[in-house]
Every structure is written in C-alpha cells, then in structure tokens.
C-alpha cells in the first residue's frame, strides 16, 4: 500500500467509496468488501464519516481515509511518503500513532519518508537518514537525529 502527502482521494466519492475502491479493483466480493471497509474505518476512527466527501473533512481526516484505503487489501508493506507533511504538529502525532497501531494490529511493515526531524525523534523505530541520496545514519534501535546532522 502507498500513502501520499497530498492524500490522492477521489473527490466525487464518499469516504466509504474511496476505501472500497481499493478492494473493487481487485474484484473483492461485495460482502467481504463492505466488511473490510467497516473494519478499516473503525481502525482509523472514521466510522461516522463514511458517507462524507473528502471536501467535508479536515486534513487529518483526509489522511486517515488515504491510510484506510492503503491498508484495505491488507498489504504486508505500507509506504508512507511524507504522511504528515500537510498536517499541524498535533495531527502529525495522531497519524504517527495510527501508523504504529497499523504496524502492530495489521502486522504491516511501514516505511515512512519524512523531512520532519520532530517526527523522526518522537518515533522510536529503526531510522535511516539519507543526505543527497547517501546513507548517513542507520539507527537500528531508533533514536535521535540532531537538526545539525
């Protein structure tokens, strides 16, 4: 699964339909599709927004819809490209905690790309730092990256 910084939601579809789309393209039977969409909307805490359209949601809610769609097919790997880039610090923390829950509950490996040093420093997982395309740090137990590195 892939999560983008700018959400990439289908504006003419509801939250439910956006998440269902990922299952429809792989011909998931309708009863399984509805069940899985409800499961992931519960996981991302958007059950009450199922019939809302993306334009009616906050940035944090839109990112949670994008995450729900990305995990609908139970991928073993989720790539999150700047998932907090368009969010304020509080919403960023919520998204990071959600990704950690998905890692644990869905048993999904998550690769997150970010330029936000605070997100990296708050996240106690393996951290790989690149500079100009070169590996400059590989902190296998997580840890802090100073703003000067």
Task: State what each model feature region is.
Residues 53-57, 61-63:
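Conserved ABC ATPase signature
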Residues 67:
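Hydrophobic anchor residue at the start of the ABC signature
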Residues 74:
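Conserved catalytic motifs of ABC-family nucleotide-binding domains
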Residues 78-81:
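Catalytic Walker B motif of ABC-type/P-loop ATPase nucleotide-binding domains
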Residues 89-91:
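Helix N-cap at the start of a conserved alpha-helix in ABC-type nucleotide-binding domains
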